């Protein structure tokens, strides 16, 4: 016999299941092999040994290739992850169809944290909204104070400002 309590408990189960379905795919993480680098903040990861997925690094922005420190940022990204197995936490899809994600390196650090710590990237406040962004911002502050990487320059220009100051036309 169906009692009001049974209906409520089944209703709760369905409500919880429905809410879980609505969660963004940000909670999904998958392993893959880094097989390529487009620039400092875009990598290609081989998923399941067959699918190439272009990943835009969540929450940070590296200098553009034609910008000061751009080539060094690309080389740092290559050194840190090419040929390594990583875990990709999908956050979003950008307007170019790339997966936006957090890359967990072997050893437990994120690629984002490493690039920011080495002074090869800025935390991008407009897009970095997750709790981990606070840690990355602290790492950026330490790199800035220590004049590490791009912070050696007197006034480094964030890539988002550089792109929209007319330099994107020179690419």
Residue ranges: model-predicted function:
Residues 2-15, 19-171:
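Small beta-barrel nucleic-acid-binding modules, primarily SNase/OB-fold domains
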């Amino acid at each position: 016999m169906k009692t009001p309590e049974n209906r409520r408990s089944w209703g709760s189960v369905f409500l919880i299941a429905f809410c879980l379905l609505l969660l963004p795919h940000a909670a999904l993480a998958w392993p893959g092999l880094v097989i390529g680098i487009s620039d400092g903040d875009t990598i290609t990861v081989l998923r399941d040994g067959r699918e190439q997925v272009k990943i835009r690094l969540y929450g940070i922005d590296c200098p553009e290739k034609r910008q000061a420190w751009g080539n060094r940022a690309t080389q740092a990204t290559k050194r840190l992850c090419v040929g390594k197995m990583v875990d990709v936490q999908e956050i979003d899809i950008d307007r170019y169809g790339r997966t936006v994600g957090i890359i967990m390196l072997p050893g437990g650090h994120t690629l984002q944290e490493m690039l920011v710590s080495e002074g090869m990237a800025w935390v991008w406040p407009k897009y970095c909204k997750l709790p981990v962004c606070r840690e990355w911002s602290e790492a950026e502050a330490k790199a800035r104070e220590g004049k590490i990487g791009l912070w050696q320059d007197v006034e480094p220009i964030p890539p988002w400002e550089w792109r929209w100051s007319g330099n994107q036309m020179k690419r």
